[in-house]
């Protein structure tokens, strides 16, 4: 990720820890004042303040304590991509992809996608090689 190594290391450290509470501190320390987090699938956008409040209160408000399992982070220049899975307490490994945009050494925007596992349709069997689905 170019000269953003310190930022990349901190993001990776927090994500590997899997603690959503740590994400509030990460947003506080390593995001721009005008940071936004967008979830295109549900049509939601959060400001920096809302991201921190939600991360801090997630277990109380949602009734679950999600666990993030880090897979990898790739990037270069001012863009990075994070891949992992999230277990919201029901054992379902929700696939996660986050695209981060960096400005002045801090995260300015995160666009995040969440996908539940699904069975592959039978008609694709002749075209694909089977692999293990994501696990938490």
Please give the residue ranges for each predicted region.
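Short acidic-aromatic low-complexity motifs
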Residues: 1-34
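A beta-strand edge to alpha-helix "cap/lid" segment located at domain peripheries
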Residues: 3, 53-136
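Hydrophobic alpha-helical core bundles mediating ligand binding, dimerization, or RNAP-core interactions
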Residues: 8-15, 31, 51, 55-59, ...
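A solvent-exposed, acidic/Ser-Thr-rich amphipathic alpha-helical stretch
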Residues: 21-76
């Amino acid at each position: 990720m170019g000269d953003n190594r310190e930022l990349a290391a901190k993001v990776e450290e927090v994500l590997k820890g899997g603690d959503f509470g740590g994400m509030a501190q990460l947003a506080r320390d390593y995001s721009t004042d005008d940071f936004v987090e967008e979830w295109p699938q549900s049509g939601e956008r959060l400001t920096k303040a809302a991201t921190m409040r939600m991360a801090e209160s997630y277990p109380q408000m949602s009734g679950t304590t999600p666990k993030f399992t880090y897979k990898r982070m790739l990037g270069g220049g001012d863009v990075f991509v994070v891949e992992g899975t999230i277990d919201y307490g029901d054992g379902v490994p929700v696939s996660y992809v986050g695209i981060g945009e960096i400005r002045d050494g801090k995260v300015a925007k995160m666009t995040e996608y969440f996908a539940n596992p699904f069975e592959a349709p039978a008609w694709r069997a002749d075209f694909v090689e089977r692999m293990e689905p994501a696990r938490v």
